[in-house]
């Protein structure tokens, strides 16, 4: 059984509230999990998804600008980590065909501006 810890980041910018669920998600190998991220500011058009292995810094999986565009980092395949964004305040990320190496903390963030 894989253990995923989904962190709640109480806003990546001053004044934004982020809710993420499920909070924890023990899953079985081969399954798919869908993580939901909701933020409360329509002006925060940038949303980010991160993966953090124990003892390491968070690594950006992908970022989306509004609902029109999602860009994955080179090491994260869009078919493994598909992201949908039905509106400015919500983003969904799935992790497809779970493997042992997918065990990590996953979290989302939102910003008014691009984060480099």
Question: Where on the chain are the PLM-derived regions?
Answer:
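N-terminal Sec-dependent signal peptide, specifically the hydrophobic helical h-region
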Residues: 1-23, 110-116
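Short glycine/proline-centered loop/turn elements that form peptide/ligand docking sites
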Residues: 15-24, 39-46, 56-57
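Extracellular beta-strand/loop-rich beta-sandwich domains predominantly from IgSF
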Residues: 23-26, 66, 72-101
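Residue-level detector of conserved, well-ordered beta-strand and adjacent loop positions
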Residues: 10, 19, 38, 50, ...
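N-terminal V-set
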Residues: 42-77
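Structural signature of extracellular immunoglobulin-like
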Residues: 32-41, 46-54, 94-97, 102-112
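Solvent-exposed, conformationally flexible loop/turn segments
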Residues: 28-30
């Amino acid at each position: 059984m894989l253990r995923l810890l989904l962190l709640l980041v109480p806003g990546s910018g001053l004044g934004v509230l982020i809710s993420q669920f499920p909070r924890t998600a023990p899953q079985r190998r081969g399954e798919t999990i869908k993580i939901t991220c909701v933020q409360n500011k329509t002006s925060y058009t940038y949303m980010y998804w991160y993966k953090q292995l124990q003892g390491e810094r968070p690594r950006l999986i992908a970022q989306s600008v509004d609902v029109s565009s999602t860009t994955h980092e080179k090491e994260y395949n869009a078919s493994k980590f598909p992201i949908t964004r039905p509106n400015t305040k919500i983003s969904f990320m799935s992790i497809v065909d779970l493997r042992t190496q997918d065990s990590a903390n996953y979290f989302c963030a939102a910003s008014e501006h691009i984060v480099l």
